[in-house]
A protein has these predicted regions:
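Helix-loop boundary and gating motifs at the non-cytosolic
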Residues: 2-73, 82, 92, 96-99, ...
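Cytoplasmic membrane-interface "Motif A"-like loop-to-helix N-cap segments
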Residues: 83-101, 162, 305-319
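Intracellular juxtamembrane helix-capping segments at the cytosolic ends
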Residues: 136-151, 356-370
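C-terminal transmembrane helical hairpin of 12-TM major facilitator-type secondary transporters
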Residues: 310-358
């Protein structure tokens, strides 16, 4: 790794002269997004909405798959083109428009279609969500490239930590609102109560997009020529062959992703099997928000003072707790007759505590491995290798017709334990910025 003097020189160069302004605009952007997710979390609010709308948990699994595939797969096809763009902010703006249209379509479906045609509404809702996630996946390449060129290395842990910390603080209030709306305190019955939550989410997302538009994007030092899809695929193959450290990271992530088979069903399990009322989702969201809040204090400090790799290993170990906790609650409920619902929100505390650390550390670790010229390709390749795993929630929804929820939770637990074992092989990244000629060697 380069020494601190090198990073100091970088931080005061012309390229980084606006980094403080960009840093805080990026933080505000993240806070607003975090609040928006509180109103419309796919694994809680939207999963229960589709289950209640259709009477089937399968649609909740499809929703999670759409979220993952839309976010992870499209970047693989456009990464080469994105690399060649001298400025990435216009792409982010165009994709924000697509995300806005997709979200407004979802609200329209809930208000005008869901009351009379629930199954058709679920399908149309998923189509709108697909538009939102696909455009979001493409915009993520622009976002991460701008982020890597605007936030100095030693401030990246604080950047993500502040985004998630203050987003979580405000998200606690959002969780209270979700609980009140779903209880009927605001005077809206199903499905209009969910349309109200989606509207709240849209307002915060729109403010987040507008905030990011104000960022001063520094010029790139060099951009490669546009690549055809075949050339881009060849670049990905070469990167994959040359970087054993990157392959090991992806192996760990894929094992961890086995936990996705159960992710949308923690909330539906509580409602369908344990008898929880939908208003308990507010407690889930509050617990998740508190978990994220506390995790940010810990993980962001450790990311800057120790390393992103250290945080990644610790948070992967913590990721085994949620599925193990639900299995324990299931045992207490069915074998001993305990009322476990008061303890069930802790599931979301544990999910957020682990997930926050992974969110802070994983992408930062990928950026540490990547050179500037091929940063979008590393991100796209990382996303593409995960895309197939995004179908696991659909498989989980199908399996629930034949096996119990406990089987899904056991599969999730096993996958994360294997990821913990494999994460021992991850090594600190060597951070450097190659010359143009060095960058071209990969292609």
């Amino acid at each position: 790794m380069g020494d601190d003097s090198q990073r100091t020189d970088l931080a005061v160069s012309d390229r980084w002269q606006h980094w403080k302004r960009n840093f805080w605009l990026g933080v505000i952007n993240g806070i607003l997004f975090k609040v928006g997710i509180t109103f419309s979390h796919p694994s809680t609010v939207l999963a229960v909405f589709l289950t209640k709308l259709t009477g089937s948990e399968l649609y909740a699994g499809i929703l999670t798959a759409v979220a993952g595939l839309g976010w992870f797969l499209p970047p693989m096809f456009v990464a080469g083109w994105v690399e060649s763009l001298p400025r990435k902010l216009p792409l982010y703006a165009n994709m924000a428009l697509g995300r806005a249209l997709g979200w407004l379509w979802m609200i329209f479906v809930v208000v005008f279609v869901a009351p009379k045609f629930p199954v058709y509404a679920a399908i149309l809702f998923l189509l709108g969500y697909a538009v939102y996630t696909i455009t979001g996946g493409i915009s993520s390449l622009a976002f991460m490239d701008i982020y890597a060129r605007t936030v100095p290395f030693r401030r990246r842990g604080a950047f993500w930590g502040l985004r998630m910390f203050w987003g979580s603080v405000l998200g606690i209030g959002g969780g209270v609102i979700v609980r009140q709306v779903l209880k009927g305190d605001w005077g809206f019955d199903f499905p209009y109560n969910y349309a109200l939550l989606l509207s709240f989410a849209f307002v915060t997302y729109a403010l987040a997009w507008l905030t990011f538009f104000l960022i001063h994007e520094p010029p790139v030092e060099w951009t490669p020529p546009p690549k055809s899809w075949r050339e881009q695929l060849q670049t990905m193959v070469e990167l994959w062959k040359q970087r054993a450290d990157f392959r090991q990271l992806i192996k760990v992530r894929l094992l961890m992703d086995i936990g996705l088979i159960a992710s949308p069903f923690y909330s539906t399990y509580a409602v369908v099997k344990l008898g929880a009322k939908p208003s308990l989702l507010g407690a889930f969201i509050i617990a998740e928000t508190v978990g994220s809040l506390l995790a940010n204090i810990l993980w962001s400090i450790l990311a800057d003072r120790r390393s992103n790799l250290f945080v990644l290993k610790c948070s992967i170990a913590c990721a085994a707790v949620p599925s193990g906790w639900v299995l324990l609650l299931t045992l207490l409920h069915y074998s001993f007759g305990f009322n476990v619902l008061p303890l069930y929100p802790l599931t979301y505390f544990f999910l957020a505590f682990a997930g926050t650390g992974i969110a802070i550390a994983f992408t930062n670790y990928v950026l540490e491995l990547a050179d500037e010229a091929h940063r979008p390709t590393y991100l796209a390749l990382s996303n593409a290798t995960e895309s197939g795993m995004m179908l696991l929630p659909v498989l989980g929804g199908i399996l629930l017709h034949y096996v119990s929820h406990s089987v899904l939770f056991s599969i999730a637990f096993t996958g994360v334990v294997l990821a913990v074992w494999e994460s021992r092989k991850l090594k600190p990244a060597f951070v450097y910025e190659p010359s143009h000629s060095e960058a071209l060697k990969v292609t």
